[in-house]
């Protein structure tokens, strides 16, 4: 009797090992796609992208809930690869099979900088823009670095890349199985992993939306006072100009001043004041920004701010949204009502090369 009980307790684990066919030998969580062209096995990055893997695993196993949407049967079984582009990728996961379908909800991007579209076999989320993930995913035929930072990588092929390459449009995912190897992977709960990240992001999103409504209701004069007080909490020595620009001079510099028509060379790093997300940096490119002041125009707060230092100087600028990209922001990079923070090092200010009478007429 004891022997029978031992067998019953451990039989599911043994069956799991048989299903792996000796491919999934390392501890981890795997997705096994059985298609009409063969089998593809992907290792899932459940530790680096727990929300995204939680979504995928929950749908695949048919035991998942987001808001008022519940799933009680495997979601992907029987779906087609509705979009296949040669020498690029195969895409599936759409219940409609048209590229327009989703599971009835959308969730946030979960970009991990160590996970990139570095070669064939990268498993990544398809989307229609920032934070519009659902159930559609793709697997690459080759490196696609232009997708980095825009699509969430959450796994990679460990077996069956030849099958990926053989898949044609309308081929079928007959079955998608989730395989867990190791104690940690077996204990890992897809719903809990998803909820932990998703609900925190959702709560933060709701707070930000409430703050945006508050900001939208303020007059420009009221907002100047509000933003100045917010910045001074961390930078008590900050100053504010008549336009509402808040700045902290770190080094005044010693020589040439910024004037209209001068050639300016500077390094900058730009972040969002709310949340602190970096959106651009000349230092990341190892290439200073060079332009002719007030000839090649910048946002008003930037143009004003660099006049407060001289060549060799350093300054932090806190630019209110109305002197940056306004109420609408800049879709894809700058949110609505976004105040911008720039850390600037003014490298050089020189006379610009003389212009001829035809300059500026080619555009």
Mark where each language-model region is.
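Cross-family detector of peptidyl-prolyl cis-trans isomerase
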Residues: 19-363
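Bacterial Sec-dependent N-terminal signal peptides
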Residues: 1-25
